[in-house]
């Protein structure tokens, strides 16, 4: 049984392996210009043909769409032939850069096989990205975002910096296919970019909207509310299209690098008071922001996005995620950090028992608290005495010598200079 392909295609179909991202975006842009729009079957046949074309030795870099059209078999299924025809026409309309004049060479050109002479330097060509244009005929109908659509778009721009050509081409394709309102574009910005990039984009968009409202836009009625509110109406297609162009143009003021500065990584500690965290942010922004950059929008954004989870829940519950800083401080002033130290639980003492102790036979205490020593389980293995333990056996104690008699002790106290009687020859004593 054959496969069934639906008419609703993924917002950004995945490119075939081996094809550059900007080339695949050109194929997608040409496919979205078809009337009626492309289906999943058309994208499937396009990827299948590109896989075969990339394996042929006749592949040229940059891609030559006329050569690809000559490689397409006759009667190939799908609308690949129409897609290549649109690319050939668009490539012919884009003026190519003039080639640099050939370098002056001496009369005797060195042979190409000479290993001592390097080949001439060829300047690498920049990736050619076709401009995004809306298809001919009726504009696309508005469709709200779904989570799978946002995930597919974020996966495509994960390696590209905000404002880069690949990033803008992917975003334009998504805007062209879904025709989002101002609320949808705000949700897309918060899902794709960091809080810092979203704050900078919001500042640039506000200035562009103010300039456009002053200049005047076709279909804009100042009495009906701001341009952002009127662009949320799905029936205002022309006015919504103007807002989409302003929203895309606001990315031009973003830096080319997606790396956030050091003050963007300041986070609130688990037990840090909210006002101390905001004070640290304020000092870091004063020392790190370039001159002329507004500080309040960035401070409000970081005060919510970099706060801990408990403060974020308080701000979100009271609707102060992007409110003035004073309201955010008042919302979190009653919050106190939880004490994380362990509290020793003191168990209440049990009343003394009425029964007698198993050891001493007296009442008023438990046997584990008895002061009387525990009796031995049996007689001593040394002396067979059942009243003491082996460690207390008298046989293990050293013997103390007996004291000398009292007479000997008295003799020791006699003076030593008394002369002893001697027997002489004369018989004198």
From Swiss-Prot:
Entry keyword annotation includes Transmembrane: no
Name the GO cellular-component terms.
Answer: viral nucleocapsid
Query: For site (Cleavage), what residue positions does UniProt give?
Result: 130-131, 344-345
The record places the motif (PPXY motif) at: 118-121
Fill in the misc note: HTLV-1 lineages are divided in four clades, A (Cosmopolitan), B (Central African group), C (Melanesian group) and D (New Central African group).
Please cite one Gene Ontology biological process associated with this protein: viral translational frameshifting
Highest rank taxon of the organism: Viruses
Could you list this entry's UniProt keywords, alphabetically sorted.
Capsid protein, Disulfide bond, Host-virus interaction, Lipoprotein, Metal-binding, Myristate, Phosphoprotein, Repeat, Ubl conjugation, Viral nucleoprotein, Virion, Zinc, Zinc-finger
Per its UniProt record, what Gene3D superfamilies does this chain match? Answer: 1.10.1200.30, Delta-retroviral matrix (1.10.185.10), Human Immunodeficiency Virus Type 1 Capsid Protein (1.10.375.10), Zinc finger, CCHC-type (4.10.60.10)
Q: Which organism is it from?
A: Human T-cell leukemia virus 1 (strain Japan ATK-1 subtype A)
- List the ranges annotated as motif PTAP/PSAP motif: 124-127
Q: Where is this region: Disordered?
A: 93-144
Q: Which PROSITE patterns does the protein's record reference?
A: ZF_CCHC
The UniProt GO MF terms for this protein read: nucleic acid binding; structural molecule activity; zinc ion binding
Please give the InterPro entries that the UniProt record associates with this protein: D_retro_matrix, Gag_p24_C, Primate_lentivir_Gag_pol-like, Retrov_capsid_C, Retrov_capsid_N, Retrovr_matrix, Znf_CCHC, Znf_CCHC_sf
**ZnF (CCHC-type) intervals:** 355-372, 378-395
Q: What residues bear Phosphoserine in this entry?
A: 105
Q: Where is the lipid attached (N-myristoyl glycine)?
A: 2
Q: What is this protein called?
A: Gag polyprotein
């Amino acid at each position: 049984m054959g496969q069934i392909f639906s008419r609703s295609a993924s917002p950004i179909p995945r490119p075939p392996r081996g094809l550059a991202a900007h080339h695949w975006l050109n194929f997608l842009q040409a496919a979205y210009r078809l009337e009626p729009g492309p289906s999943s079957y058309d994208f499937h046949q396009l990827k299948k043909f590109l896989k075969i074309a990339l394996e042929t030795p006749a592949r040229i870099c940059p891609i030559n769409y006329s050569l690809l059209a000559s490689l397409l078999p006759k009667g190939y299924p799908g609308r690949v032939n129409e897609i290549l025809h649109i690319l050939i026409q668009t490539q012919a309309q884009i003026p190519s850069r003039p080639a640099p004049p050939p370098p002056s060479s001496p009369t005797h050109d060195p042979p190409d096989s000479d290993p001592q002479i390097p080949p001439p330097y060829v300047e690498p060509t920049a990736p050619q990205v076709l401009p995004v244009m809306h298809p001919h005929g009726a504009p696309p109908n508005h469709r709200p975002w779904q989570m799978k659509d946002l995930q597919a778009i974020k996966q495509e721009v994960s390696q590209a910096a905000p404002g880069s050509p690949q990033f803008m081409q992917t975003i334009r394709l998504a805007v062209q296919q879904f025709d989002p309102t101002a609320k949808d574009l705000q949700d897309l910005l918060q899902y794709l970019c960091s809080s810092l990039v979203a704050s900078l984009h919001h500042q640039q968009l506000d200035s562009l909207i103010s300039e456009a409202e002053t200049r005047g836009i076709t279909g804009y009625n100042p009495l009906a509310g701001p341009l952002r509110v009127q662009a949320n109406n799905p029936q205002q297609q022309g006015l919504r299209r103007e807002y989409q162009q302003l929203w895309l143009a606001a990315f031009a003021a973003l830096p080319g690098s997606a790396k956030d500065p050091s003050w963007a990584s300041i986070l609130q500690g688990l037990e840090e008071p909210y006002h101390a965290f905001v004070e640290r942010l304020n000092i870091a922004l004063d020392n790190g922001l370039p001159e002329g950059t507004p500080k309040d929008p960035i401070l409000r954004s970081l005060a919510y996005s970099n706060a801990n989870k408990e403060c974020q829940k308080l701000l979100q519950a009271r609707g102060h995620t992007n409110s003035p800083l004073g309201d955010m401080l008042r919302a979190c002033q009653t919050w106190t950090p939880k004490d994380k130290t362990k509290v020793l639980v003191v168990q209440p003492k049990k009343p003394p028992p009425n029964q007698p102790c198993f050891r001493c036979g007296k009442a008023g205490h438990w046997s584990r608290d008895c002061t009387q020593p525990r009796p031995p389980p049996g007689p001593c293995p040394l002396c067979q005495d059942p009243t003491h333990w082996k460690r207390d056996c008298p046989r293990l104690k050293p013997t103390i010598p007996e004291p000398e008699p009292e007479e000997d002790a008295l003799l020791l106290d006699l003076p030593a200079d008394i002369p002893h009687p001697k027997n002489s020859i004369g018989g004198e004593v």
